[in-house]
């Protein structure tokens, strides 16, 4: 299993976090620590080849116990095909979780807004 580390960058002045090329068979997406500089609200885009998999955005305050993030309408941030959601999050950590499917290769791109 390969660990997929989040990549942090500033794109056009906006903080962005990415996990690229996640597969269910070989990869573990690592957590991202949310700080004041990296936002309190944001949008997430799921893209790539899903191959029957489901991608969910999760949060945790201890980095061990994870729960699904809800969007602004209270719906779980989860997709089986290319999708985009807006969310707020005050948890200490966030990460994507890819389950099921095969022959998948998914990118997760988050733009964070807040105190930066």
Model-based region annotation:
Residues 1-38:
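Transition segment at domain starts
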Residues 4-8, 55, 108-110:
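Generic structural motif
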Residues 16-18, 64-72:
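Surface-exposed loop/edge segments in extracytoplasmic proteins
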Residues 30-37, 70-116:
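Beta-sandwich interaction modules
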Residues 38-49, 96-98:
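A short beta-strand element within beta-rich, extracytoplasmic domains
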Residues 40, 53, 92:
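Residues that flank catalytic or metal-binding motifs in active/ligand-binding sites
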Residues 46-54, 100-106:
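Extended, low-complexity, turn-rich repeat/linker tracts enriched in Gly/Pro/Ser/Thr and Asp/Glu
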Residues 58-60:
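Conserved Ser/Thr-centered positions that define the repeating blades of beta-propeller domains
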């Amino acid at each position: 299993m390969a660990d997929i580390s989040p990549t942090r960058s500033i794109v056009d002045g906006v903080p962005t976090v990415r996990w690229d090329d996640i597969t269910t068979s070989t990869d573990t997406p690592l957590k991202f620590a949310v700080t004041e500089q990296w936002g309190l609200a944001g949008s997430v885009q799921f893209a790539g080849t899903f191959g029957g998999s489901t991608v969910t955005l999760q949060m945790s305050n201890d980095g061990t116990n994870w729960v699904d993030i809800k969007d602004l309408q209270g719906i779980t941030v989860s997709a089986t095909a290319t999708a985009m959601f807006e969310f707020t999050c005050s948890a200490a950590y966030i990460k994507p979780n890819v389950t099921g499917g095969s022959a998948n290769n998914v990118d997760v791109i988050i733009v964070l807004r807040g105190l930066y």
